[in-house]
A protein has these predicted regions:
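Membrane translocator/pore-forming domains, dominated by Gram-negative outer-membrane beta-barrels
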Residues: 3-205
Length: 205
């Protein structure tokens, strides 16, 4: 059994994607693209402590960067600092549950029609994920997963060359249902574990 074990970890990540909102414009008509692309990257480091083989708690911090670019022009670039904590439950029967919280302070620039405005704000949110993994006779491990996450964004007011405006704070939630797949290969020089996942994601605001 694991009792009183501690450790550190480090991870780097990068994401890139695009969206095509199902929306209409009330003031300019519904012509023209409303599609946009998103990208983000960052690095995080953390410290975890296992009370026993089932319960682990930890804290983490890191830096991140993101870009938002509409097809019709303009761009928003953000830099942020993040911190948070997590609790993980793994009883050893294939089930796991993970609850995490994070807070992000960010600032950046918005480019639009030749002007450059500064943005500043904070975001906080939590994620609850659980799953159950089982192994096939071939050695393939299949792990159905369920995850719910929510975030709240607090944006400071923006002043620009033609006046000023107040930004509405945003709240959003996401439900993810999916399954992970992995298989362990023991080699002379170590262990290789190829991993993949498929998910259905529903966003709420």
């Amino acid at each position: 059994d694991v009792k009183g074990a501690a450790g550190t970890w480090l991870r780097a990540y990068a994401n890139d994607g695009s969206m095509s909102p199902d929306a209409k414009r009330s003031n300019f008509g519904d012509v023209g693209s409303q599609d946009y692309s998103l990208s983000s990257s960052g690095i995080e480091a953390g410290f975890g402590y296992s009370f026993n083989s089932a319960w682990t708690v930890g804290v983490f911090g890191g830096i991140n960067q993101g870009d938002y670019k509409p097809d019709v022009g303009g761009k928003v670039s953000l830099d942020g600092n993040t911190w948070g904590g997590y609790v993980t439950f793994t009883p050893g029967n294939g089930f796991y549950a993970d609850l995490s919280y994070r807070d992000i302070g960010f600032d950046g620039d918005a480019l639009n029609n030749g002007s450059k405005e500064q943005l500043d704000g904070d975001a906080s949110g939590f994620s609850l994920e659980m799953g159950y993994g089982f192994k096939m006779q071939s050695g393939l491990e299949i792990e159905p997963q369920l995850q719910y996450s929510a975030v709240s964004v607090d944006l400071d007011n923006v002043a620009y060359t033609s006046g000023g405006f107040e930004l509405t704070d945003g709240d959003a939630a996401q439900l993810r249902i999916g399954s992970a797949f992995r298989k362990t290969f023991n080699q002379d020089n170590g262990v290789w574990v190829p991993y993949g996942a498929v998910s259905y994601i529903q966003n709420y605001d």
